[in-house]
From Swiss-Prot:
It comes from the Bacteria. Negatively regulates transcription of bacterial ribonucleotide reductase nrd genes and operons by binding to NrdR-boxes. Coiled coil: none annotated. The lineage of its organism: Bacteria, Bacillati, Actinomycetota, Actinomycetes, Mycobacteriales. The keyword DNA-binding applies. This is Transcriptional repressor NrdR. Keywords: ATP-binding, DNA-binding, Metal-binding, Nucleotide-binding, Repressor, Transcription, Transcription regulation, Zinc, Zinc-finger. It comes from Corynebacterium glutamicum (strain ATCC 13032 / DSM 20300 / JCM 1318 / BCRC 11384 / CCUG 27702 / LMG 3730 / NBRC 12168 / NCIMB 10025 / NRRL B-2784 / 534). GO terms for biological process: negative regulation of DNA-templated transcription. Belongs to the NrdR family. The keyword Repressor applies.
Length: 150
């Protein structure tokens, strides 16, 4: 890390703190040459591999936006959506890879969304799983009821 004041390439860490709900680390550093102090933020980048092969950084906000559409008209708070997005990010990061397929993000959304709101779950699942008929909805509802009894 280069010092922003004198461009020296060595500094020591004075303080480290976890920020952004554990997704980043804030480090306070001191240059070993000029003793200038500066802050760095380190974040592990998680890349999403889309169906067409293009990659982009993971975005909790995209998860919230997608789920919010499914929750439209439902009594689901923004805080609940943010918690769900955090849970999804934790799930996809837990595999230890720096890349995740977009399809895996959709799978990671399904279970917590079903627990949050069943109607929103059905709406999201109908798009994610490409439902073609009312029969698809009926099958999914039967699956939900079976899982509810387990």
């Amino acid at each position: 890390m280069y010092c922003p004041f004198c461009q020296h390439d060595h500094s020591k860490v004075i303080d480290s703190r976890v920020i952004d709900a554990g997704s980043a680390i804030r480090r306070r550093r001191e240059c070993s040459k000029c003793e200038g102090r500066f802050t760095t933020i380190e974040k592990a980048v998680l890349l999403v591999v889309k169906r067409n092969g293009v990659t982009e950084p993971f975005s909790r906000e995209k998860v919230v936006t997608g789920v919010r559409r499914a929750c439209q008209g439902r009594d689901v708070s923004d805080d609940a959506l943010k918690r769900l997005a955090q849970q999804v990010e934790e799930t996809v990061r837990s595999n230890g890879s720096s890349q995740v397929r977009a399809n895996d993000i959709g799978l990671a959304i399904l279970d917590p969304l079903r627990e949050l709101d069943e109607v929103a779950y059905l709406r999201f699942a109908s798009v994610y799983k490409s439902f073609d008929s009312a029969d698809d909805f009926e099958k999914e509802i039967r699956l939900m009821r079976r899982r509810g009894r387990d």
